[in-house]
């Protein structure tokens, strides 16, 4: 399918990107290397294993907030939000620049590992790039591909004209019953300990207080209209509707909308004080704001029975890609909800990412399944890493290369044993996919 139906004018934006890169070359000279699992393989590892395939589930890159300035977002503060370079929910210019750099890095890494020869244009059997049909995901795939294979004149796939959710990426519930609802609420309540849902909100009180202060909520138009003056509704109401995403009402939802916009503004606005509406915020403060987003995502998509339900189409697709003989590289572009539900359905261990204010699914982050083969025995293994641009790389538009890679965090799968190199037996990982797929079939 042709990919010229991106609402932003791709060719126009690419011209601007070239001017960005000419300036960014100088910046790369001053960047200290960050830890990357892809780039830190030991000589012993390289002597024994060769890379055979990579399957990536990516979150889109930086977008404008989902809500416009005339929504609750514009009324909840006395301050003016930044002037976004895109319409609500769409990929920003900065997001395009950053994703192009990610595409360039991934190509250099795969060439360095011998998966592709330098300058080689892979065929459609070898490379599969597939995006959800929202503008921000289609544009992310376009920019990634322009960095990954700039001279190959390749098309990538998206099912619908933007913007519409593709069932593969739509984290909707396809099985709902009273039994399912009861189990989902039980698992979600457990996240808050003995106080359940209220306990979840109480754990965020410091974050709520911070957002109220930063936005000057008590003096906002929303407060004056008698709507929202404080984030004090701790009785989050959850709804599970067949064919729709899990949803909620209460302060956690409102706080997530604000936190999402603040974090995106922090990435877009280079002036720290302007990004914080004139406040002096520390990195820890930004982490506390971002924590709201992490908890919000966990409440909606991390409960085992919910994750298994909403991630089912992606689990089937990812498993098929990992088992494809011809495929060398798969790049799927979706959302943070996709990464959250897939990692929880597969029972990944709890984690907190370093060098980023977003500790779970940073903007533009990629869940990377690497298939390695033992050169001697031909036995196959899987390594899983979460690859992401650090907060500094995002805010300073730092160039990526093999000497200055994005951050890479090695993920662990609960109940599976990795070898000394962090590799899992291929059959064990496929078995975990089968377990999650079977668990979906058991949902009533």
Predicted regions and their residues:
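Bacterial N-terminal signal peptides
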Residues: 21-32
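Sec/Tat signal peptide C-region and signal peptidase I cleavage site
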Residues: 33-37
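Alpha-helical and His/Cys-centered functional microenvironments
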Residues: 12, 22, 339
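Signature for phosphate-centric chemistry
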Residues: 38-126, 132-330, 334-444
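Short beta-strand/loop turn elements enriched in aromatics
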Residues: 19-20, 66
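N-terminal leader/targeting signatures
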Residues: 16-17, 26, 41
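N-terminal secretory signal peptides that target proteins for export/translocation
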Residues: 1-17
